[in-house]
């Protein structure tokens, strides 16, 4: 990922997910997130709901909700991720499943 901008209560990141890749199933205690699909197609899990999002579509992930992003296509996926909250820390993460074994 690449941090594009930081403020006192927000961070904006660019995230690239390669073909077949996915983020861990995770939640955050201190922040909400908003994802914008900039390029490609994303399979998004929020709690027990699964949606497919295409370019220019967005989704909001409330604080405390389990969520995951996956790229099941043959091309790369690029999202712009907004973090909102009073505590914005990379360690504010609880992982439930992770293909990279970071649990």
Indicate where each model-derived feature is located.
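A short glycine-rich, His/Asp/Glu-containing loop-to-beta-strand
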Residues: 1-32
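A structural signal for the main folded, soluble domain(s) of proteins
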Residues: 4-7, 41, 68
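Short glycine/proline-enriched turns and hinge-like loops at secondary-structure junctions
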Residues: 28-29, 54, 71-74
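Glycine- and acidic-residue-biased ligand/ion/polar-headgroup-sensing regions
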Residues: 30-48
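Double-stranded beta-helix
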Residues: 68-103
